[in-house]
Amino acid sequence: MFDDLKEYLREWFKKVITSRLFVLAVVFCLMSSALVMRLFNLQIIKGEEYQDAYTAMTEKVIKTASTRGNIYDRNGNVLAYNELAYDVTIQDTGAYKTDAQWNTMLYDLVSILNKHGESAQTSLELTLDHDGNVVYTSETQSGRKRFLCDYYGLKNVDEMDDSDGKYPSDISAPDLLERMKKEYHLTLGDDKNRDGRPLDKDGNPIDVSDEVALQIVGIRYTMRFTAFQKYESTTIATDISDETVADILEHAADLVGVNIQESTIRVYNESIYFAPIIGYTGKVTSERLEELKTVNDDYELNDVVGRTGIESSMELELKGKKGSQTAYVDNVGRILSVTGEVAPVAGNDIWLTLDLNLQKGIYHILEKQLAGVLLKTIVNQDEKDIAYIDSSSIKIPIKKAYFQLINNNVLSIDNFASEEASDVEQQIYQKYESSRVRIEQELRGELQSENATPMNALSEEMQAYMQYIYSYLSSSNKAIVQRDAIDTSSDMYQAWKNGTISLREYLYYGIANNWIDTTKLDIQSRYSNADDVFTALLDDCFRDLEQDPAFEKLIYQYLINNNVVTGRELCMALYSQNVLAYDENEVNLLRVSGEEYAYQFLMNKIRNIEITPAQLALDPCTASCVVTSAKTGEVLALVSYPSYDNNRISDSTYFAQLNADQSLPLRNNATQTLKAPGSTFKPITAIAGLEEGAITLSDMINCTGIYEEVSNPIRCWKYPGFHGPLNVVGGIENSCNYFFSEVAHRLSTETDGSYKPEKGLETLKKYATMFGLDRTSGIEISEATPSISDTDPERSSMGQGTHQFASVQLARYVTALANRGTVYDLSLIDKETDSQGNLVKDYSPAVASTLDFQTSTWDAVQQGMRQVVTNSSTKRVFDGLDVHVAGKTGTAQESQKRGNHAFFISFAPYENPEISVTVSIPNGYSSSNAAMVAKHVYRYFYGYASLDDILNSGALDASNERINGD
């Protein structure tokens, strides 16, 4: 039996060996053995060695930020400094693999920030405006293209607008946001398997609002710039509150890669007085980064830099020098150890020539003067009952002031509809809501009627609504009406412009002529007719208008005009929304009183500066004043009203409010607002006439009231009266239009008696250029470029024509008048010191040129300017002022429907000028208002009034009567 078993095994073994599978089995066993041995060697014998080699692979140099230099006024008062703060940073640790994971984490992070009134700050140049529309934040067209170029991942802007249409340079802001939402799968696209929407705790997808989406895509976009440097964290929120810090740390397990980091933030003292000058800091834009890297390669996309003002122009001096850390990082960018460190060098300090208290006092003088003008101008009448005389006597109906409380967002219409709304707010909203439904029904009925009423036959209110609908459909955001495709020479277009056809008829014409973009309408059928398109257009339009704040405001305008919403209700709402500090007595009086009391109430609030000219944004609501040292050219004050708080500029909600504010607080009115100078230009004409020999000191020009030596006769302001014979001093004192027209005419006359206007224009330009009016003033912040008139020498001689100058440019000119010929390149900067106080650079104003005119010329011009103050109608403004002032008033009309612009240039003391004061009030009605500001500036500067006197006073007296000769 044993032998049988043995024989059986022998036969079996023989079969196995001779089998073709035997060789394969042997090979498999050998390979398995080799693999096991290799794994044993890798994991057991050399595992630690390989792990070390894997994790400690790269040495990197990580830059550390320097401390930004401080900014001081001329007396050492700190205006800008740094303060310890906490930032939120984010780093890609590799924990999140899918879009859904990333978006969920970022949604949670953004929700925490928003809950505490904060938001993500990113390099994305998109935001929501005050009405909730997505808009670009790029400051220039080239900046927007540079941003888009970076987003597309292109090297230069020339690569955009490719034939495939992948990289359009004209993509709208809303379309760009939609594109980015699809890119990061924040919205459900065509690929249902790539749903990257954030998930709630139950795993359900969340549809995010545009506000949240902008922050999420902004973070992801910004992180792209450190995608290959994962050891670099990205700062996405700065100066967060302690509550936000605690909330983020509490949810740290769900926010992998999110950290709290100590940093510094920029803090501005007395911000409202200096914001237009100092500016603000923020994350560097792509365009600015490109510019900075040409002079300092240390700049990176996450850097905070000066965005405007002195912060921007002195960026390189304030920034300092970055430090560095040398560190080992692993393959996913985690820092393993720091092996070396170079400390950063603090930036230098900048000292301004400006005086804090002078700046502050003038700001409030301007505000109170504007309030005084409004008190003279606002009347308790309806617009239809106000008689128009001329642009110096325009009145503002009180209902327009009431509407501005809504129109300029002093009152929030969203609050009217909120659950927390007061009784009066609910009443206002109920009136609005019932009216809105009625108005929509009337509009639909009119637009759907085959016998629609022509525009000019509609009521004023219905015309306004129809015009708004058309403007909305043709706006850049909506662009259903393609304006570029409209044939403006067609009869239908002309009929529309003339109001002889209805909006319905015009839109049907647009459908037939293919300038209605049907791709943007929800049309189900591929073979739709004109009626289908028009119905879809109306449905789309009215659906949008229900959520459109601007249309809502238009309805409120007519509710106020028609006495449906009353001034009394709106004044009470000022207390409900905490615009005014609660006063129970006033609220009760408003509740039981009528509209006359509401009018007096609002006027008192304007008088007491509880409601400011900037809030109402009525004419006038802006002004500027520049004070210079006549002896040194230093700018002692450069004030723009209104202003803003640059400490809050990183708050996107606040920034949107500033951009929506109709008083334009972000504009520096002293440097950016260009206006014709009016009669303030006449001293230049006088100098040109004397120095060129067109007139002499003894020449008498006989004013007859109307100058008829030109084809378009020029009336003197005294017409039908006349001045009679005047010399140059009298011409300036009386600001005689006839006199200066004759001077310009003589400057335009050749020796042979022929009249050549270009000769006169060239001569006026020559002397204006001597005073620096052909170029910017030299100050270290952004400034609009001036222009000297190139048409009509006679009118140009009086400051009309095409002259355009900013206040700071007129200030340089009058400074040279005051010091008799030293033209300075003005400067806002006194000096630069290092962090230890050592002088680095002196910025004393440079002398641009010295004007070598005859002493008698200076005497005559200065005497004429002195007599403007002592003998002309301006005398009543300066009565009682112990300082001897010389000056020249000026007004300029830009529109017959708005008040004249008001100017006053001056210097004092007349006998030995120390300072010059230049005042500009756009739409300020009369130059007496500008002169009144100057008077109060001199009183304050020379100690006849204190800062407390200014701060504790109410609105200043104003006069809308025109000064003779302006």
What role is predicted for each listed range?
Residues 69-74, 263, 269, 275, ...:
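Active-site beta-strand/loop architecture of penicillin-binding DD-peptidases
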Residues 38, 76, 106-109, 248, ...:
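Active-site SXXK
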Residues 348-349, 395-440, 444, 448, ...:
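Conserved catalytic neighborhood of penicillin-recognizing serine enzymes
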Residues 1-605, 616-624, 630, 744, ...:
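Membrane-proximal periplasmic segments of bacterial cell-envelope enzymes
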Residues 57-60, 89-98, 230-238, 263, ...:
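Second-shell loop/turn segments in exported
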Residues 88-101, 643-663:
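A short, polar/charged loop-to-alpha-helix boundary motif
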Residues 647-649, 681, 690-710, 821-832:
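Short, well-structured active-site flanking segments
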Residues 622, 713-723, 755-794:
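Mid-domain, small-residue-enriched loop/turn segments at the edges of structured enzyme/sensor domains
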